[in-house]
């Protein structure tokens, strides 16, 4: 799956753009955000995606790991902020685990009832080189051959409720 970056002017606009992309493409939408007040602008689009069961992945920059819980500039408790408007929220603390957390984010967003997830990435972690993981047969804890099932989250069959005694309204091509 290739990623194309599209610029936006505010995080809430980016969140709604990712939501729209996910709805029309049948793939999870991805949005990025700065830490602090900018990250709070993602709450509304993530809440909408949660209620509409749209898979979104929010990658949010966090403060440096050494500055966590020290009242750093624009430091927020992002875990608490996103807990009520996402299915899953985590903070990466080691560069060697970035790939695992990205995999888990995709699986969490696309499996079960689809919905938004948030992943916090400390600013200093983004500057570190991450070792390339050897990918033989696993995507996080899921086999690689299963990921297609999670990414294509829209039902392929239409479900129809039939009542022989009633007219079937709203069904395309229905004739009495």
Task: Describe the function of each predicted region.
Residues 1-176:
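N-terminal alpha/beta PP-like core and its mobile active-site loop of ThDP/TPP-dependent enzymes
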């Amino acid at each position: 799956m290739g990623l194309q970056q599209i610029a936006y002017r505010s995080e809430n606009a980016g969140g709604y753009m990712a939501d729209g992309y996910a709805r029309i493409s049948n793939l999870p939408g991805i949005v990025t955000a700065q830490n602090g007040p900018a990250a709070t602008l993602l709450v509304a689009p993530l809440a909408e995606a949660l209620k509409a069961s749209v898979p979104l992945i929010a990658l949010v920059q966090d403060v440096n790991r050494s500055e966590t819980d020290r009242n750093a500039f624009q430091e927020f408790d992002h875990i608490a902020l996103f807990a009520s408007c996402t299915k899953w929220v985590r903070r990466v603390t080691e560069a060697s685990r970035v790939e695992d957390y990205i995999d888990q984010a995709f699986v969490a967003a696309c499996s079960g009832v689809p919905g938004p997830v948030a992943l916090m990435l400390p600013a200093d972690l983004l500057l570190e080189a991450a070792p390339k993981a050897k990918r033989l047969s696993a995507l996080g804890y899921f086999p690689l051959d299963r990921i297609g099932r999670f990414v294509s989250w829209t039902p392929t069959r239409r479900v129809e409720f039939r009542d022989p005694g009633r007219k079937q309204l709203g069904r395309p091509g229905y004739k009495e």
